[in-house]
Amino acid sequence: MIPRYSRPEMANIWTDKNRFRIWFEIEAYALEAFEKQGLIEKGISNQVFEAVGDKKYDFDVDAILDIEKTTKHDVIAFLTYLAGIIGENSRFVHMGMTSSDILDTALSKQLDEACEILIDDLKRLLAVIKKRAFEHKDTICIGRSHGIHAEPVTFGLKLARFYAEFDRNLARLEAARKEIAVCAISGAVGTHANVAIEVQDHVAEKLGLESETISSQVIPRDRHAMLFSVFGVIASSIENLATEVRHLQRTEVLEASEFFSKGQKGSSAMPHKKNPILTENLCGLARIVRASVVPAMENVALWHERDISHSSVERMFAPDATVTLDFALNRLINVVENLLVYPQNMQKNIDQMGGLHCSQRVLLALIEEAKISREDSYKIVQTNAMKVWEEGADFKSLLKNDPLVSSKLTDEKIDSLFDDSHHLKSVDKIFDKVFK
């Protein structure tokens, strides 16, 4: 996590101050539950809240870290620091609890807060893609398979595909958020022997989390693995859209391009350059997010009721993945919103192949109307198509001058096979399905 690829809204979730605030709230809400159980006198939790007051937003991080140098234990260091603020009531804090009750519940809360931001990012991205998709619903361009001209699509359809992909990602993230947003206050090995289930339920409700069904010393890591897997899928979708823009911005294609601002420079050596730097950057950032997926999977298999092998990994990749993904989504929003589209170049690229994009329509006409076998029809069409590739001839003219075709299809029929509106006849229905 570096400032260059961070937004403060997300980065602030992972600050020490925010982490210690959540730790305090977990401990204080547990005191409320202890009062309800009659384990401590009523009013103690209020005394603790009042003693801390607004300090919970501004705990002395350096002081806590100094204590940790001695304790070699972050939670004990925090509890020692907290005791200095709340005094005698500190003896009731953390009763029957273990460090993972604090660490895991806090991590769940941080990931829940991160998901809230990411869900908003996705909704804003979807709105921008939808707007541009309708803007170019009927903007015809060539579709490509294997990088080679295939048949026409519309630029709006391209964007509609990405809309549907990110809409699926939104549903995945909402489901994964629900799965990760859990609280576990279950004690040393998850048995609730020394801290009642009701304490966990109360803290969960106060934090806006669900109460974990069953835990060991830790929240099961399959929950985290699911969330980071979804992060990886979203990152791949970002790269998918970014790669499309990069290809379309190639000089010999130039059907769309990133906005190039006044004063922007593309190369220190070549003043003419306008490079797709934002989408290239997004492809790189996607790799960072995906790099968290395998470690998250490997964290699932902890020893018995818990070992600490997951901890160092999560301290690194939880902030890195969420901050990077948030930045990437916001950069992608900017790219799509300001994307330059060149319909004239799209038509020019269609025309440069001499009508080959209509080869399937000719094939089907020979099969269905001329009653020629599929094998023979394919051979006739391919023979003429190869002349276009090799000689630069016009496909339609070749067909009209081929006796095998002209004896079966009239010139008017052949002309109709090159009407590109045929390729757009289902666009409205597709849009209705995507944007229903």
Report residues per predicted region.
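Generic, well-ordered alpha-helical scaffold segments in large soluble proteins
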Residues: 33, 81, 85, 128, ...
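Short amphipathic alpha-helical segments with heptad-repeat character
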Residues: 112-119, 123, 130, 160-163, ...
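Glycine-rich cofactor/substrate-binding loops
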Residues: 1-22, 26, 67-71, 270-436
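Conserved helix-loop functional segments at active or binding sites
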Residues: 135-138, 172-175, 179, 209-213, ...
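Acidic, glycine-rich loop-and-beta core segments that form the ion-binding/anion-interacting portion
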Residues: 200-293
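A helix-coil-helix interface module used to build multimeric assemblies
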Residues: 1-186, 192, 197-202, 211, ...
